[in-house]
Amino acid sequence: MSLDKIMNEAISPWMKGDGPDSDIVLSSRIRLARNFKQYQFSTMQNEEEAQKVQELFKKKFINKAVEPFGKFGLLKMNELTPLQRRVLVEKHLISPNLAGTEYGACLLSESEHISVMLNEEDHIRIQCLFPGLQLSKALQSANQIDNWIEKEVEYAFDESLGYITSCPTNVGTGLRASVMIHLPGLVLTKRISRIIQVIQKLGLVVRGIYGEGSEALGNIFQVSNQMTLGKSEEDIIADLKSVMQQIIQQEKLARELIVQNSSIELEDKVYRSYGILANSRLIQSAEAATCLSDVRLGIDLGYIKGISRNILTELMVLTQPGILQQYAGGPLGPEERDYRRATLIRERLRIEKN
């Protein structure tokens, strides 16, 4: 695994595929939180203990192949520049919390759909990402990695409570399941607030594209479970999947309603946004996200032909500030970023059309 490859290829291999309900669901993620019995938790540990966790992983797991995932490499946060850390966050490979630690690290698969974060809020956080609505498949992969690690270490586990974690909401299975979903129909019909209220009443959490505290740029929302204690992994997955299927149905109905009642207005909105993306010389990230959402909706509804629906996911990542600066080879001012963002989008659309 090459750091240059990770940094210079903004789109992870798993992002290029499709999955069930990919017209609305962009990705499914499973995260398992675990702690080692022999060490203090990350929130309490000192530098020496944090380094011991890193050394344990370096000795036991680096460059070891796990079928069918291949080999894993180790990225240490204190060996990366702030810009490189930001790129990893923008690619959804690590959390903003891990990027801010000096003694954190990430065990990463070659396909980049599996990462194991070390010394974040817990000793390890196993993350698996899949395109579309594939929670069960993601859980299966996460459990394979979990079993692989558990052969070499003893987890902090209580017979009554389950896995012991730093945050009480993760105690139990330690499982956080989440789905990234594109909901322009519900936003345009002004039904999104009511839907979010219903989701929250069901014990789920709705966040923006980069998790807690982030905005829902481009009409992309992240829906996840909140509590894990007292529920099995299978029940958590089944509950979230059931809610997601209802949201998918509501989004489809909203899109149908717009097409029936406001077809010309919607088509105009889609093509105006396409025109902005195809011709702008300067574009800010928020405007780019809005226009990309409109174009993706136009592709899904058949208004725009000859452009891959994955363009939303791809360009939402490619046009983030960190990745733009990584491509530029160094820091960029706001206007320089807006110029490069617009240039990259125009070029990507031109290639797609040809």
Swiss-Prot record:
UniProt-listed Enzyme Commission number(s): 2.7.14.1
Q: Which residues form the Phosphagen kinase C-terminal domain?
A: 24-254
Q: Which reaction does it catalyse?
A: L-arginyl-[protein] + ATP = N(omega)-phospho-L-arginyl-[protein] + ADP + H(+)
| GO MF, any single term | kinase activity
Q: Report the InterPro entries cross-referenced here.
A: Arg_Kinase, ATP-guanido_PTrfase, ATP-guanido_PTrfase_AS, ATP-guanido_PTrfase_cat, Gln_synth/guanido_kin_cat_dom
Q: Which UniProt keywords apply?
A: Allosteric enzyme, ATP-binding, Kinase, Nucleotide-binding, Transferase
Question: Do you know which Pfam families this protein is assigned to?
Answer: ATP-gua_Ptrans
Keyword Amino-acid biosynthesis tagged: no
Q: Where is this motif: RDXXRA motif of the pArg binding pocket involved in allosteric regulation?
A: 337-342
Activity regulation text: Appears to be allosterically activated by the binding of pArg-containing polypeptides to the pArg-binding pocket localized in the C-terminal domain of McsB.
Q: Which residues are the signal sequence here?
A: none
A GO BP term here is: phosphocreatine biosynthetic process
Q: Which GO terms describe its cellular component?
A: extracellular space
Indicate the segments annotated as coiled coil, or none if absent. none
Q: Which residues bind ATP?
A: 27-31, 92, 125, 176-180, 207-212
Q: Which HAMAP family match?
A: Prot_Arg_kinase
Spell out the family assignment given in the record's similarity comment.
Belongs to the ATP:guanido phosphotransferase family.
| Function in brief | Catalyzes the specific phosphorylation of arginine residues in a large number of proteins. Is part of the bacterial stress response system. Protein arginine phosphorylation has a physiologically important role and is involved in the regulation of many critical cellular processes, such as protein homeostasis, motility, competence, and stringent and stress responses, by regulating gene expression and protein activity.
Which protein is depicted?
Protein-arginine kinase
Q: Which organism is it from?
A: Bacillus cereus (strain ATCC 14579 / DSM 31 / CCUG 7414 / JCM 2152 / NBRC 15305 / NCIMB 9373 / NCTC 2599 / NRRL B-3711)
